[in-house]
């Protein structure tokens, strides 16, 4: 019985907190490495098998069976052809391993010293694997660590059991300062493997999820799933918004999160360096949710554009600065929380904007439908915004517009349908036409400009070069300076050719 091996396995397993199987594997690998050094060849493959009950061990030299070949073997000290192998055992197949018992090295002081580095490496790998297994399950949770080292770029946290977490400077709340041995909470957002440093536990104190997890601790109703956090947005260290809802009508979700005399929300705020937190009532109606999220500003009116996923919000002029917030903070957080692009303006600006847009729509109706201003205005006042709505709404809805009878409604729908059909045919024809590469690569050219040019039969750089500024402004929306620059860019190769001919 080799008691030395068993004693080393027991002590290292207890000291490192690693299973005995891992230590046995490490010692086997170490003994195999020491045994291999007895051979003159560099790539001899040795396997050592330790009896985990007695500590006795055996050593074997190994060859892998490969296909017969006329060429020399890639690893002659580790491989044997199938023909050679079957001279030893006729049942062997490609991929099998032939083992030959060899004399084992003694597990003495010299062998221990030679094997030490291998054992340490194996144990370190096992510890790293253990850390990854332990913390992979905790991604998305709060963790607590002790500040071990502070640098300009990051803070290293001691998580215990040889585990360390990395808190990068950009994941720290501004103006936050920690000292060695300070305890702090953070949100574990990733576990990754670094070849040099081992497992990297990446934590954050700035992410919205950190705020959410803190509320889960302070508000038991969230853990009990009586209250649900639907979203959060933060300007770390300054301000945050969090949206909550409940399916239990008897509970006030905002009041529960605020707590008695603000105790719950204050506890969260203190952890975040005094971050001001707005608790918003969630609503499945996006417009109502935005109204709630804009608090403390009161929304006077709101216009939703689902196509562009934007909302125009009008507030009283006196509340405009409050609605926007310092450096746009309030509207930015509301936008992040709701997922909508928000445009905040005064009621007068909203009216002016909508009047301008209504004017454009009215002009489009007059041109496309060939109607007078009165009919176009009636369509706009009734809420029709484009030709598709005119063409495809139920005829009863169109007849409900003041001054429209059945004949007028039918004629408007016919005209709108004809225009849309013509546009679709033109679009298909346009798809078949493609701008030349020399047109697309001109300085100042955009995809939208190229599309408009192609619509007007300007397909190449030379087509554009022949246009004047006035010609260009008549076919696309562009100012004088931009038009001149674009035309000069298109003509540049003409001048280059002239210079080349002169020289």
From Swiss-Prot:
Q: Name one GO biological process term.
A: DNA-templated transcription termination
- Matching InterPro entries, A to Z? DNA_repair_Rad51/TF_NusA_a-hlx (IPR010995), KH_dom (IPR004087), KH_dom-like_a/b (IPR015946), KH_dom_NusA-like (IPR025249), KH_sf_prok-type (IPR009019), NA-bd_OB-fold (IPR012340), NusA_bac (IPR030842), NusA_N_sf (IPR036555)
Q: Name one Pfam family in it.
A: KH_5
Read off the CDD domains from this record: KH-II_NusA_rpt1, KH-II_NusA_rpt2, S1_NusA
Establish whether keyword RNA-binding is in the entry. yes
Output the Gene Ontology cellular-component terms.
cytosol
Q: Which residues form the KH domain?
A: 308-374
Where in or outside the cell it occurs: the entry states: Cytoplasm
Q: Which GO terms fall under molecular function for this chain's record?
A: DNA-binding transcription factor activity; nucleotide binding; RNA binding
Main subcellular location of this protein, as a coarse class: cytoplasm
Domain of life per record: Bacteria
List the NCBIfam families hit by this protein, alphabetically: NusA, nusA_Cterm_rpt
Q: Which family does it belong to?
A: Belongs to the NusA family.
What function does the entry list?
Answer: Participates in both transcription termination and antitermination.
Question: How is this protein organized at the quaternary level?
Answer: Monomer. Binds directly to the core enzyme of the DNA-dependent RNA polymerase and to nascent RNA.
The name of this protein is: Transcription termination/antitermination protein NusA
Organism this protein belongs to:
Coxiella burnetii (strain RSA 493 / Nine Mile phase I)
Gene name, per UniProt, is: nusA
